[in-house]
Amino acid sequence: MSDQQQPPVYKIALGIEYDGSKYYGWQRQNEVRSVQEKLEKALSQVANEPITVFCAGRTDAGVHGTGQVVHFETTAQRKDAAWTLGVNANLPGDIAVRWVKAVPDDFHARFSATARRYRYIIYNHRLRPAVLSKGVTHFYEPLDAERMHRAAQCLLGENDFTSFRAVQCQSRTPWRNVMHINVTRHGPYVVVDIKANAFVHHMVRNIVGSLMEVGAHNQPESWIAELLAAKDRTLAAATAKAEGLYLVAVDYPDRYDLPKPPMGPLFLAD
């Protein structure tokens, strides 16, 4: 008797949006809420088999995503609406699938990515916000966004980011390639937009923490360049809070033809 034929395996990519304020980060962990665990549970219900997802970037506790990308493999053959509307019906309100795309075998959400982009949102006002309290970081001292932008330009290109790297970072190298970093003001909001090939642990939040010191005129514009050259985390400012940080986009080679929805968050244009 011939062996039973194995069902075909499909590889699917999804775009995911989430409010990370009630989660202990992206990665599945025992006994605490994670975005990965909720997504895998919802996908498994739709697929009627256990699903494991792989993501482009494992965000920390309290960090949000508008442009997270994941992939998974399944023998379940479903219409696109099942992987979007169907999965969303099984997800909590603070996690949502934005798009679905069948991808070839060589695609990997993490290893195929060529760049990641983050936006950090500062609510720069004397009084704290209420409605967006978990979606922005409040900073009450007046910030000079143009000064912050000028100071940040020394971070462009390939550099050793030891001064902006968490002590517990497990990456083999502190070197990263920053493609752009822009600081702009939108009314009471100051936005730090940074894109790099990859990021060391807490890199964006550590950079923002130091840029806020420059923006508040507590440090000179030259301080960021001095920190970069010093390669000493203890000299830089405290890590900025998680609430204001969003993973907004992940770049992949054009041949995968993945959707590119608006990055956001909220009012921010691409």
Curated annotation (Swiss-Prot):
One of the GO biological process terms: tRNA pseudouridine synthesis
Catalytic reaction equation(s): uridine(38/39/40) in tRNA = pseudouridine(38/39/40) in tRNA
E.C. numbers: 5.4.99.12
Enzyme class: isomerase
Positions annotated as active site in the UniProt record: D60 (nucleophile)
Site (Interaction with tRNA): R58, R78, R110, R126, F139
InterPro entries (UniProt xref): PsdUridine_synth_cat_dom_sf, PsdUridine_synth_TruA, PsdUridine_synth_TruA_a/b_dom, PsdUridine_synth_TruA_C, TruA/RsuA/RluB/E/F_N
Region of interest (Interaction with tRNA), ranges: 168-172
Any one GO molecular function term: tRNA pseudouridine(38-40) synthase activity
UniProt keyword terms in alphabetical order: Isomerase, tRNA processing
Pfam families assigned to the protein according to its UniProt record, in alphabetical order: PseudoU_synth_1 (PF01416)
Chain positions covered by the region annotation RNA binding: 107-111
Binding locations of substrate: Y118
Stored Gene3D superfamilies: Pseudouridine synthase I, catalytic domain, C-terminal subdomain (3.30.70.660), Pseudouridine synthase I, catalytic domain, N-terminal subdomain (3.30.70.580)
Recorded family membership: Belongs to the tRNA pseudouridine synthase TruA family.
Reported function: Formation of pseudouridine at positions 38, 39 and 40 in the anticodon stem and loop of transfer RNAs.
Quaternary assembly: Homodimer.
Name of this protein: tRNA pseudouridine synthase A
Organismal lineage: Bacteria, Pseudomonadati, Pseudomonadota, Gammaproteobacteria, Enterobacterales
